């Protein structure tokens, strides 16, 4: 009897699962992070922004413009059309506005066009200018009030406070070494804290002491805060002091000072806490939070009946708090109202809630705890009560009452998703528009003006365009494979506007925090400078309305102490209050705990407790990790560094022609593929009526017919072939949301990133030294690891000053054989096989007309001859771009296609390359066990098993022990057993097969109990000395292929100023011979080799042309001249006003001629290469060179010097 139980993944794949935990909760939809947020933006976000900014009134108050509602019209293009036409998938937005004339009472309502709003596709991406983009969610500090505690050099604790808004000025409190408290308003110089208290309208020292109670730090601060100007009251002086800090050097009056302070903190238009900021402040300052664990210094009674709730000297425990909580929420319990001075920033009474407790430092001393009262959630600005309560908390910290905050705690960091980021951008545009509307209101005639005339939509359109086009968070979607797409949509970045920067982020921010548990994946993060700043959402996590990440837990009943199936989603803040058991904790059938002592989590500690202490239990072990990490079998047996690489490398797997699902999976593959957006999903249940490679038709139960079109070989963002193949047969019954067609890297509706080759862990002739991989030729012959890359090339025919460019077959000086694959219009035919340098689109551009002589003008007038020439600017296949022409698209103005200004025709040619696995390609398993292919060995030479089967891949066993990714060995053995038994298995992370399960399955498959076998050498037939581990592992081919990296240059472009070769494959550059390489040649004394490297091969402009000429003619190479870099140095020194001359050995000045002065030495290499054939025309070539090249050289100084077969305008991608 086999271990585990059978589970169906979709209709087409069955796996034997080793999971021992019942799944209480289904995975949420994995792209909801994006789609739900955008839906919120459309439903509520847009309205919120309009409500914030409208109504807009003019300065006199005669006119007022109000928002009534908005609607989106039908998008101009569908998703596929937008992709094809390089357009944006967007819907026109019309806003209904109401203009009221307050004097006449006349109302005008009008629908105003507000630009196109980009729409989200069903899978959570946007199409902008034809490219698929993702808006990455941002992880930022939540608005709220934060307290920090630090120790100075004397060991005394110093506290600081920051009040952070969503937008607006910061407020900071701090103590110094002398125990004086200060405030900084909006990052300015500090003032005594009591100045801010006085500005709230609490003027005298005695009032301040009454309000906050006597303490050392308060007394020191009052001593520091002296009354300077007796003409002003203390309140007026305080307000002026703050004004002086904010606007130094400006004349200050009480009124202007008051209005400035009001505008900075208390004006809802300028200061916004957002609902989350208000929620955090209310939570932090409320007495519910602050009383817990304190000793009461007064008796608390019911205000209605006088019944005692808690006596003096009671310690507030959970039980006491349960009784107190309802009273603390009441508006008549322990409320105190202070009447501020009329000169304060706000004259309204300030109501707070106050309760006295004993100090933790001096138990005899009473400390007053003050909360901000009950402020409604829609009050998004600060109130004086907030300021006073936050100061009270700050003073209480000195008495060890209250807690400091950890900024890296996920209760203090929140997620800004697409909807919110887009809303902020929309708000910026609308605020800019508001200014224009106000101005226009005062200029135009109030009787005739309409809403349309007041609105200028340019700022709104511009700010949305800018966001999608150039924001750091709007990213080109990763489309190597569906897992990459899905992960990109679930990514959380701490970078971007309003976030951190790479250089300023320290270790603390990047580190794994205990609150990441079940919220952010501790494994999946990039390896480079962004490590820890870019994270991935955990698989079961959701984001609440405030932007905090919540994770699900099973509730444990308080009465029975049994685990229920009731699920609660907890934020990191809430989770801190509970003790939580792990998902692997053994349970009885009735839900009670088997053991008397349970290992559980409490905040950052692991504790052992009895079952009655447990509040919650994890839902499932894989809730800790992200989707990509959850796809790694035996993750629990891998070292975390290698697991990180494994998670990241799966996203780089190349889509293969015929992928196979992994024999050893985790059960996550089906959902990952289903939710990625690459699979074709049934919209409704029904029966399949027709299937072919391009279309599937399904008849619903109510008789309607659904038609689904499959994607065929579409080029993805990363030049991969995205191709869909049917997953259903004629007559199949389909349920809603079934996978009816596999996308790329999918098999039977599951993610299938690679293949399942037979792998042996053994060395072979040193071919797998240092992570190199040795492959069998079978993998090449049978196209096991063959993928398709599709690249697109564009050619545009524009209007130039000298006339329009023309796409044509008539090209100057081009032989017929070069045109054999072009059609009558000069465009390559679909299906043609093209190689480097072949013409794809024939195009000619008018050349400059030379001055005509009188006779030529006469001839031109008589015969109408075209006197001006054209030059060939055809689109050619770039280096390494050869392949089969897969598709050609032609867009013209006449056909009504939208082209950029000045373009008449655009041709796009798609070239597909079939790439077999070869030496130099990168491969990897799912455990970070990556390597490059070092040898492809004939099948007959490969080591073979006792039954004669040659192995497919040999990996070096030395790659395992030091890296500690043992998961690959367990996968290898289980994979071998699964293939033998003809089954697929699932081993979910942290809850899958253990070692015993693996060996049991190996035994049942009839494999030797050590999992090893004798291996024979394919060349000699001799057995190797030791037994070898052989099995089946899911192995991937990664996107880093040698074809994309290999590069060589003989002749190519040079940099304009230095005249040295460019660098890099994209620029067709040379290899840099650097400082240290020069030392090496110097050490060898290779003087002539070094000289030619520093002159002809680099920047001796004249010398290299002459050298080329000499090589072509077979003559001796002349001596080199002066390198251009020397001339650049001289010119730089001359530009500093130094008189630099170059002298020879006899102290005679050497003339450094400018490049375009003597152009006979700047012959184009094109003409030189022809010289070899036509040396007799040498004189003529020089003559024409002298006259014509002067003009040409000025124009072409920045052109690459290239032989005849180099194209002038390089294909720029």
From Swiss-Prot:
InterPro entries reported for this sequence: DNA-dir_RNA_pol_bsu_ext_1_sf, DNA-dir_RNA_pol_bsu_external_1, DNA-dir_RNA_pol_su2, DNA-dir_RNAP_su2_dom, DNA-dir_RNAP_su2_hyb_sf, RNA_pol_bsu_bac, RNA_pol_bsu_CS, RNA_pol_bsu_protrusion
Catalyzed chemical reaction(s): RNA(n) + a ribonucleoside 5'-triphosphate = RNA(n+1) + diphosphate
UniProt EC number: 2.7.7.6
A GO MF label: DNA-directed RNA polymerase activity
SUPFAM superfamilies xrefs: beta and beta-prime subunits of DNA dependent RNA-polymerase
Record keywords: DNA-directed RNA polymerase, Nucleotidyltransferase, Transcription, Transferase
Record-linked Pfam families: RNA_pol_Rpb2_1 (PF04563), RNA_pol_Rpb2_2 (PF04561), RNA_pol_Rpb2_3 (PF04565), RNA_pol_Rpb2_45 (PF10385), RNA_pol_Rpb2_6 (PF00562), RNA_pol_Rpb2_7 (PF04560)
Residue stretches of biased makeup (Basic and acidic residues): 1171-1199
Similarity annotation: Belongs to the RNA polymerase beta chain family.
Function: DNA-dependent RNA polymerase catalyzes the transcription of DNA into RNA using the four ribonucleoside triphosphates as substrates.
Description of how the protein assembles with itself and partners: The RNAP catalytic core consists of 2 alpha, 1 beta, 1 beta' and 1 omega subunit. When a sigma factor is associated with the core the holoenzyme is formed, which can initiate transcription.
Name of this protein: DNA-directed RNA polymerase subunit beta
Gene field: rpoB
């Amino acid at each position: 009897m086999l271990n585990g139980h059978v589970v169906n993944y979709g209709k087409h794949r069955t796996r034997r699962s080793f999971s021992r935990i019942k799944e209480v909760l289904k995975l949420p939809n994995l792209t909801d992070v994006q789609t739900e947020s955008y839906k919120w933006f459309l439903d509520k976000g847009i309205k919120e922004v309009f409500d914030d900014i409208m109504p807009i009134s003019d300065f006199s108050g005669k006119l007022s413009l109000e928002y009534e509602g908005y609607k989106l019209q039908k998008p101009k293009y569908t998703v596929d059309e937008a992709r094809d036409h390089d357009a944006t998938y967007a819907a026109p937005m019309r806003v209904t506005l109401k203009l009221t004339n307050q004097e006449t009472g006349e109302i005008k309502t009008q629908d105003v066009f507000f630009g196109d709003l980009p729409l989200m596709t069903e899978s959570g991406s946007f199409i902008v200018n034809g490219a698929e983009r993702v808006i990455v969610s941002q992880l930022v500090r939540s608005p709220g009030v934060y307290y920090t505690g630090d120790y100075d050099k004397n060991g005394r604790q110093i506290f600081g406070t920051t009040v952070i808004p969503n937008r607006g000025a910061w407020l900071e409190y701090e103590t110094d070494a002398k125990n004086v408290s200060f405030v900084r308003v909006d990052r300015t110089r500090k003032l005594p804290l009591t100045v801010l208290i006085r500005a709230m309208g609490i003027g005298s020292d005695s009032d301040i002491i009454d309000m906050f109670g006597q303490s050392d730090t308060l007394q020191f601060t009052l001593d520091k805060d002296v009354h300077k100007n007796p003409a002003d009251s203390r309140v007026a002086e305080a307000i002026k002091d703050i004004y002086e800090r904010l606007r130094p050097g400006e004349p200050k009056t009480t009124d202007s000072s008051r209005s400035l302070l009001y505008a900075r903190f208390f004006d809802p238009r300028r200061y916004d806490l957002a609902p989350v900021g208000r929620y955090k402040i209310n939570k932090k300052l409320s007495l519910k939070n602050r009383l817990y664990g304190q000793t009461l210094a007064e008796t608390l009674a019911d205000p209605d009946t006088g019944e005692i709730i808690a006596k003096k000297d009671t310690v507030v425990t959970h039980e006491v708090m349960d009784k107190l909580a309802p009273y603390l929420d009441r508006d008549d319990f322990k409320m105190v109202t202070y009447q501020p001075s009329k000169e304060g920033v706000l004259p309204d009474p300030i109501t707070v809630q106050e309760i006295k407790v004993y100090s933790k430092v001096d138990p005899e001393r009473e400390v007053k705890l003050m909360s901000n009262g009950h402020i409604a959630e829609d009050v998004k600005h600060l109130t004086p009560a907030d300021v006073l309560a936050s100061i009270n908390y700050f003073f209480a910290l000195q008495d060890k009452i209250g807690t400091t905050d950890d900024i890296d705690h996920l209760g203090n960091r929140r997620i800004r998703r697409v909807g919110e980021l887009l809303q902020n951008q929309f708000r910026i545009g609308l605020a800019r528009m508001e200014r224009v509307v106000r101005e226009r209101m005062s200029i135009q005639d109030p009787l005739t003006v309409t809403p349309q005339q007041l609105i200028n939509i340019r700022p709104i359109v511009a700010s949305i365009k800018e966001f999608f086009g150039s924001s750091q968070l709007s990213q080109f979607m990763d489309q190597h494979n569906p897992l990459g797409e899905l992960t990109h949509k679930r990514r959380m970045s701490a970078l971007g506007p309003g976030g951190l920067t790479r250089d300023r982020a320290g270790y603390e921010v990047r580190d794994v925090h205990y609150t990441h548990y079940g919220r952010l994946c501790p494994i999946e993060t990039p390896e480079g400078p962004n490590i820890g700043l870019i994270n991935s959402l955990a698989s079961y996590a959701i984001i609440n309305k405030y932007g905090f990440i919540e994770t699900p837990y099973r509730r444990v009943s308080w009465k029975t102490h049994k685990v229920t199936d009731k699920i609660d989603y907890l934020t990191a803040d809430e989770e801190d209050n509970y003790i939580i058991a792990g998902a692997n904790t053994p349970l009885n059938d009735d839900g009670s705990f088997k053991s008397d002592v349970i290992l559980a989590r409490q905040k950052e500690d692991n504790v052992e407790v009895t079952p009655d202490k447990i509040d919650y239990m994890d839902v499932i072990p894989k809730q800790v990790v992200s989707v990509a990490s959850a796809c790694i079998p035996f993750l629990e047996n891998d070292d975390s560094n290698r697991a990180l690489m494994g998670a990241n490398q799966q996203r780089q797997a190349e889509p293969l022609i015929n992928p196979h699902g992994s024999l050893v999976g985790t059960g996550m593959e089906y959902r990952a593929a289903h939710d990625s957006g690459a699979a074709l999903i049934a919209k409704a249940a029904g029966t399949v009526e027709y299937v072919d490679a391009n279309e599937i038709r399904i008849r619903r139960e109510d008789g309607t017919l659904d038609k689904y079109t499959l994607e065929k070989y579409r080029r993805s963002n990363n030049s991969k072939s995205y191709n869909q193949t049917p997953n259903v047969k004629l007559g199949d019954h389909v349920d809603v949301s079934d996978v009816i067609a596999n996308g790329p890297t999918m098999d039977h509706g599951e993610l299938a990133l690679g293949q399942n080759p037979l792998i042996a862990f053994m060395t072979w002739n040193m071919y797998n030294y240092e992570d190199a991989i040795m492959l069998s030729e079978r993998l090449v012959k049978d196209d096991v690891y063959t993928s398709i890359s599709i690249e697109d090339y564009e050619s545009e025919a524009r209007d130039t000053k000298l006339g329009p460019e023309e796409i044509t077959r008539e090209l100057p000086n081009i032989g017929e054989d070069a045109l054999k694959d072009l059609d009558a219009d000069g465009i390559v035919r679909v299906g043609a096989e093209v190689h480097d340098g072949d013409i794809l689109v024939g195009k000619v551009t008018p050349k400059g007309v030379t001055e005509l002589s009188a006779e030529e003008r006469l001839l031109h007038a008589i015969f109408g001859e075209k006197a001006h020439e054209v030059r060939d600017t055809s689109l050619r296949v770039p280096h390494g771009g050869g392949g089969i022409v897969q598709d050609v698209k032609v867009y013209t103005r006449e056909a009504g296609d939208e082209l950029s200004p000045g373009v008449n025709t655009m041709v796009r040619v798609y070239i597909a390359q079939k790439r077999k696995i070869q030496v130099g390609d990168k491969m990897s398993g799912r455990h970070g066990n990556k390597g490059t292919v070092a040898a492809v060995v004939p099948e007959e030479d490969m080591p073979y098993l006792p039954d004669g089967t040659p192995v497919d891949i040999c990996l070096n066993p030395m790659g395992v022990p030091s890296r500690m990714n043992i998961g690959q060995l367990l996968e290898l053995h289980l994979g071998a057993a699964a293939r033998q038994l003809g089954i697929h298995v699932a081993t979910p992370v942290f809850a899958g097969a253990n070692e015993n399960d693996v060996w049991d399955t190996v035994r049942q498959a009839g494999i030797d109990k050590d999992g090893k076998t004798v291996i024979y050498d394919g060349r000699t037939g001799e057995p190797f000395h030791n037994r070898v581990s052989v099995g089946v592992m899911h192995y991937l081919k990664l996107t880093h292929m040698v074809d994309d990296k290999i590069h060589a240059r003989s002749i190519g472009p040079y940099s304009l100023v230095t005249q040295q070769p460019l660098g890099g494959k994209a620029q067709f550059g040379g290899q840099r011979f650097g400082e240290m390489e020069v030392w090496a040649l110097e050490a060898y004394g290779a003087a002539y080799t070094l000289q030619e490297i520093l002159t002809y091969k680099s920047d001796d402009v004249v010398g290299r042309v002459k050298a080329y000429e000499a090589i072509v003619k077979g003559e001796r190479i002349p001596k080199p001249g002066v390198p251009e870099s020397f001339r650049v140095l001289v010119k730089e020194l001359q530009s500093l006003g130094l008189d630099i001359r170059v002298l020879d050995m006899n102290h005679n000045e050497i003339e450094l001629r400018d490049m375009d002065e003597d152009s006979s030495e700047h012959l184009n290499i094109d003409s030189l290469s022809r010289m070899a054939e036509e040396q007799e025309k040498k004189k003529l070539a020089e003559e024409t060179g002298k006259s014509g090249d002067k003009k040409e050289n000025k124009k072409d100084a920045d052109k690459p010097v290239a032989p005849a077969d180099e194209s002038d305008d390089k294909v720029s991608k």
